[in-house]
Amino acid sequence: MATSGANGPGSATASASNPRKFSEKIALQKQRQAEETAAFEEVMMDIGSTRLQAQKLRLAYTRSSHYGGSLPNVNQIGSGLAEFQSPLHSPLDSSRSTRHHGLVERVQRDPRRMVSPLRRYTRHIDSSPYSPAYLSPPPESSWRRTMAWGNFPAEKGQLFRLPSALNRTSSDSALHTSVMNPSPQDTYPGPTPPSILPSRRGGILDGEMDPKVPAIEENLLDDKHLLKPWDAKKLSSSSSRPRSCEVPGINIFPSPDQPANVPVLPPAMNTGGSLPDLTNLHFPPPLPTPLDPEETAYPSLSGGNSTSNLTHTMTHLGISRGMGLGPGYDAPGLHSPLSHPSLQSSLSNPNLQASLSSPQPQLQGSHSHPSLPASSLARHVLPTTSLGHPSLSAPALSSSSSSSSTSSPVLGAPSYPASTPGASPHHRRVPLSPLSLLAGPADARRSQQQLPKQFSPTMSPTLSSITQGVPLDTSKLSTDQRLPPYPYSSPSLVLPTQPHTPKSLQQPGLPSQSCSVQSSGGQPPGRQSHYGTPYPPGPSGHGQQSYHRPMSDFNLGNLEQFSMESPSASLVLDPPGFSEGPGFLGGEGPMGGPQDPHTFNHQNLTHCSRHGSGPNIILTGDSSPGFSKEIAAALAGVPGFEVSAAGLELGLGLEDELRMEPLGLEGLNMLSDPCALLPDPAVEESFRSDRLQ
């Protein structure tokens, strides 16, 4: 300014001094504004915090003594916002109104007050669940009644200390103690500040169910279908356990086949602690029925060794359902269950026997069902397939591989010993319980076509007859050759299928005897050991006895015996002759009639001369295209079987050809080659003619 004054008259000095005055004024104004703003913010902060505190205190005071959890009831606090907005008339207001009355006072207190309210405010905002305030033991049960709510000192510090006392019981340790030692008066004495855990779900408090928000049980559990496990203890738990400690509702959707009203969660949730005790939860096994009906690999089958579910699985596989379906299996989803690799293991699993061995109504029904014979029995008879009885198929593995190729995969193992992966070749005596799997859709189609015809032999007549469930009469086999019925673990397990046999197997044309697998008796006098020659049909009793016969005879160990060594001494098909035509199976055609060599591609079946009893493994039904290659590979070693790959891969059950010729590398390649076509045009022709009939 001295320089400016020297430079000019007063106007110069004025102009020089003006900017300074302006800047000073501006600075002063800004300072004032900042102070006022700060003071205003402080006041608003105080008001807001005290209002929240007072509101919370009032809520806590009016709230029922059973405060249900460690999270605040956000719904109620939200609905009470109007109260937050409305002015609070209390000693706090009067003391505060006199406190901030002028700018000067604000400015004087500014440095101190700008910090303290924030500090206090954050003190209760920051209290995390594990802060010391939370971890302190809960106050005595009568504290709520002894506290003088109306006489708050004007000092705000005490007010801000209240939240810690209120929130104290929200800590985990306090939860544990209050859960384990509930006192009727004070289960959860006070609410937590909404700012701390605003995510509390509305309507969860036991003491007060907010009408706007349904309780968790109503939301998550359908009252009609699922029992609420904690319903019975609601009265006790409402006063003793914070709802937050309960499992709100683990909604496990039951499989459609499962009774819906079985409680999914056991009521034993009272084990204390803020985490639910999951040890007692029984989750239902994975859906035995695939959600996608076209799905071929059954999740339940995936556990080869968990045979406990096997009968369950079998039921879902349609053994109970599909078997009863009638001529047409409507079980698209039932594609060859055998295709699952794990099935093999389960087959070899002795326990399987137990689960399957008991003739459960389902199994029996499925076996006995007439439709079964065609599709399930029929697709293939393993060397000793006891096709004779559909129920037998139960004993036998009747994999629903409608394509013979499918069965052939099973059959494919010439050396039977290897046929089941699980069965060590000749000596593992694992009783194979029959695994009767329904045929897939292809089977259904086929069975529909065939059943009317009485199983016109779709494959070579013999095969078809087998397919049709024509029982192989093993009784004709010399006893050493004859397969004993499956070694059911307990003789009692014998399937009482005889009654069913007539139904299922005996088609009009079929003598009941043909339905039976004569494992029980020696060769019937009339029967010849070779299937090629017709023999008089035995009494239907055959079926009965063979079926009822304890399956104890069959052992997996015998599979080896399936090695098809002597063609002549092989299995004999029970029916007088399986005529190639539908009659072959006793279909419409006459039962008698020597079999066409075509039928079994010859004595190949007979090759299965089994020196010992062997399980009947019947693969029936469509194997889905995915029929397990492992099974095919396992069976591929059996010297007598050749499966056309087309059937194997494509699931063209009728198209597959079961040939008893030794399987060479080419045969193995065929098995793995999805594109392989049936090599024999004659066979194709017979298939076509079958369809035309």
Swiss-Prot record:
Which keywords are on file for this protein? Acetylation, Activator, Cytoplasm, Host-virus interaction, Isopeptide bond, Methylation, Nucleus, Phosphoprotein, Transcription, Transcription regulation, Ubl conjugation
Query: A Gene Ontology CC term for this entry?
Result: extracellular exosome
Q: What is its main location?
A: cytoplasm
Record note on what altering S368A does: Reduced cAMP- and calcium-regulated phosphorylation
Q: Where is the composition biased (Polar residues)?
A: 1-20, 447-468, 498-507
Q: Output this protein's name.
A: CREB-regulated transcription coactivator 2
Molecular function (GO) terms for this protein are:
cAMP response element binding protein binding; transcription coactivator activity
Q: Which residues carry this modification: Phosphothreonine?
A: T169, T192, T501
Q: Which residues are modified to Phosphoserine?
A: 70, 86, 90, 136, 171, 274, 306, 368, 393, 433, 456, 489-490, 492, 613, 623-624
Q: Where in the cell is it found?
A: Cytoplasm; Nucleus
Site location (Required for ubiquitination and degradation): K629
Q: What is the lineage of its organism?
A: Eukaryota, Metazoa, Chordata, Craniata, Vertebrata
What happens to this protein after translation, modification-wise?
A: Phosphorylation/dephosphorylation states of Ser-171 are required for regulating transduction of CREB activity. CRTCs/TORCs are inactive when phosphorylated, and active when dephosphorylated at this site. This primary site of phosphorylation, is regulated by cAMP and calcium levels and is dependent on the phosphorylation of SIKs (SIK1 and SIK2) by LKB1. Following adenylyl cyclase activation, dephosphorylated at Ser-171 by PPP3CA/calcineurin A resulting in CRTC2 dissociation from 14-3-3 proteins and PPP3CA. Asymmetric dimethylation of arginine resisues by PRMT6 enhances the association of CRTC2 with CREB on the promoters of gluconeogenic genes.
Q: Where is this cross-link: Glycyl lysine isopeptide (Lys-Gly) (interchain with G-Cter in SUMO2)?
A: K234
The entry's function note states: Transcriptional coactivator for CREB1 which activates transcription through both consensus and variant cAMP response element (CRE) sites. Acts as a coactivator, in the SIK/TORC signaling pathway, being active when dephosphorylated and acts independently of CREB1 'Ser-133' phosphorylation. Enhances the interaction of CREB1 with TAF4. Regulates gluconeogenesis as a component of the LKB1/AMPK/TORC2 signaling pathway. Regulates the expression of specific genes such as the steroidogenic gene, StAR. Potent coactivator of PPARGC1A and inducer of mitochondrial biogenesis in muscle cells.
Q: Which gene encodes it?
A: CRTC2
N-acetylalanine is found on A2
